[in-house]
Amino acid sequence: MASLLQSDRVLYLVQGEKKVRAPLSQLYFCRYCSELRSLECVSHEVDSHYCPSCLENMPSAEAKLKKNRCANCFDCPGCMHTLSTRATSISTQLPDDPAKTTMKKAYYLACGFCRWTSRDVGMADKSVASGGWQEPENPHTQRMNKLIEYYQQLAQKEKVERDRKKLARRRNYMPLAFSDKYGLGTRLQRPRAGASISTLAGLSLKEGEDQKEIKIEPAQAVDEVEPLPEDYYTRPVNLTEVTTLQQRLLQPDFQPVCASQLYPRHKHLLIKRSLRCRKCEHNLSKPEFNPTSIKFKIQLVAVNYIPEVRIMSIPNLRYMKESQVLLTLTNPVENLTHVTLFECEEGDPDDINSTAKVVVPPKELVLAGKDAAAEYDELAEPQDFQDDPDIIAFRKANKVGIFIKVTPQREEGEVTVCFKMKHDFKNLAAPIRPIEESDQGTEVIWLTQHVELSLGPLLP
């Protein structure tokens, strides 16, 4: 019964650019292509950037300028949780009368988990609650900025060279006699719009400005390394003052060795992204723009369109002995769905993981439509489907339990069975051309899914 909640034991095959096997809850369904889609066969588009702490929304250009970090929120350098701003009162001397003191509010950063504070590293308190926190300066900033400018100029030069070579290849392929014979010579000799090869030869990176080539000094290897202190191997080590590997990797520009060198880092921004089908370029998932909203404008998850198979009970599986496995089929749509199960044909390229022989019900299965109110209505009259008790174990609302027979074909290892599931689907997507008056109702199409079940290990 515990296998009923283990959806990762039932995999569906996605026939995309690359064959992917994944649970139905991790897949999408394109209503225009009528095919399953995985995260590897969709296009990812960034809709917006936002801070997960203060939920500030910002455009992509601003996020790039801020290096994809929030300007107001910080992460604890010790445990990586969000830092909070604490207020305290400190006594300060009056500028008019130094002998007298007055209470003044001061703010500092503190972590509620590991008790780290900005005072531990000597950061001065601030008189305002947000902004203005001291940040350590990277000694290699100038060198890195110089390298970035140099390679940007180099990339621009290479782009100009590529454009020059492309225009040099565009030459007249028709012979001069042929063009003169049919009166095309004058037409071909007319000046063409756009830049010619001669004008392109004098192209510069910035037209109208003096080009100053950026030169950088090559890095030089150091022959002599600074020796270690004499007491490096003999002095006792206090592990509470030594940073962990994760703490050092979170600050690669400083690589702090001691806990006293840990400074807070600006919090990374998160994104809201849209997913688009690569084949038809329709949206499969599109969230709302507001960071506080968890709703979606478009969310074509496969569990809302494709019948879901789950394993309800697994008997003791033994080599070359037939066992009966109970599965559940769930209809996610509101109309009746007809499902037919059949075994994979011999030599099927998709049937590569099967280790057991499976016998599925030969009859067509009818699943009732999804009705949320009927699940809680005990007085509702059940529909009469005239089920065969040898095939149907139970039926409740839009769920039905069916029996399949499994015979393991290998003496050891995991038991995996594969079969095909054919079902009808009413395509409710908006058609490209308007439906003619003679067409009645929505289009019904038949889809076939490849399903793999992981039934666990064999018993001796």
UniProtKB/Swiss-Prot annotation:
Modified residues (Phosphoserine): S196
Coiled-coil segments: 152-172
Matching InterPro entries: DCTN4
This protein's record includes keyword Acetylation: yes
Modified residues (Phosphothreonine): T407
Function recorded in the entry: Part of the dynactin complex that activates the molecular motor dynein for ultra-processive transport along microtubules.
Protein name, entry field: Dynactin subunit 4
Organism phylogeny: Eukaryota, Metazoa, Chordata, Craniata, Vertebrata
Gene symbol of the encoding locus: DCTN4
